[in-house]
Amino acid sequence: GIKILEEIIRNNLPAWNDTSEFTYKSFGTPLEYLLYTKLYEPEKEVKSVNCNLAGVYWMYCHGLMKKGRYDEALAAIERAAELNPVDPDVYLQYAELMKLRKNPEGIKFACDKLLQCAVTKEQIGRAYFNYSYYFSEINDPIKAAALLEMCGIFYKPDLYESELQYISNCLGM
């Protein structure tokens, strides 16, 4: 798994570095291209990478996380975000990494970015779920409960009930 991803990265990385004229991005859909151009208003001409290299990097991040190599995982997910700053999967993976690194502000950053580019109900719900986690981490159970409720409008993850119980316990209920 990881060795194959490292080989893909090693073979493709030099070809997709930005130049003075072009910025190279790895969009999964035409909608992501449109979101990127509207949100970031790039000064350089945008050239699309012909493979989902951002996806390779976030999968690589996931593998590194499983091995406890969090610093390397952070570098990988940051590169994924450079290649496609409007890919919701990148920010979902980023949030999971920040949870493991016990970095609440990183979780909030990932949620903020995710809500900018979320296009499905599940992605919106997962952003609210991670916001709920963030507010639990900073000991604000009222906001955590409100955001968990928002999550439930769009998406009910497997952990929904256990998170609700945790927040209820924090509130003394």
What are these regions (language model features)?
Residues 56, 90, 124-127, 160-161:
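TPR alpha-solenoid repeat register
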Residues 13, 51, 85, 119-122, ...:
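Short coil turns that delineate tetratricopeptide repeat
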Residues 6-11, 109-117, 139-159, 165-173:
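TPR/TPR-like (Sel1-like) alpha-helical repeat modules
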Residues 63, 96-97, 134, 167:
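Residue-level signature for tetratricopeptide repeat
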